[in-house]
Amino acid sequence: MRQYGLIGHPLGHSFSAAFFAQKFACENIDAQYDNFDLVEVGNLRNWVGEHPLLAGFNVTIPHKQAVVSQLDTLSPEATEVGAVNVVRVVRESNGTLRLDGHNSDLLGFTRSIAPLLCPIHRKALILGTGGASKAVVVGL
């Protein structure tokens, strides 16, 4: 069974575990999704190594920017935004770990806002300075 999850702090507000449990069951996917309430991510690679079934995880507040420096590769979107909300865990045949960072906030925002924008829309007030707001800045 593969394991996926969410890292962040605090996670009491998150509905991800329930959502993915239902999704995996409906799609007959042999996987589980767990919330990992991590106060800090300073030793991310070691933490991933302690979870041998972990194939990937989502990243939420306050770690979207902090994880960037600990990843092996970044997608073009993650590089442009400077924040990551999806990490793919690749376990190489020689035993090494590769952590690939992605940002789906940018695509999610731009696809959802595009139908609502008109040429007269030239300014926006963005509240926040975290990883998601950075994606909004890039998206606009």
Regions found by a protein language model. Name each.
Residues 2-117:
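Phosphate/diphosphate ligand-binding glycine-rich loop within oxidoreductases
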Residues 8, 103-106, 113, 117-140:
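Glycine-rich adenosine-cofactor-binding loop
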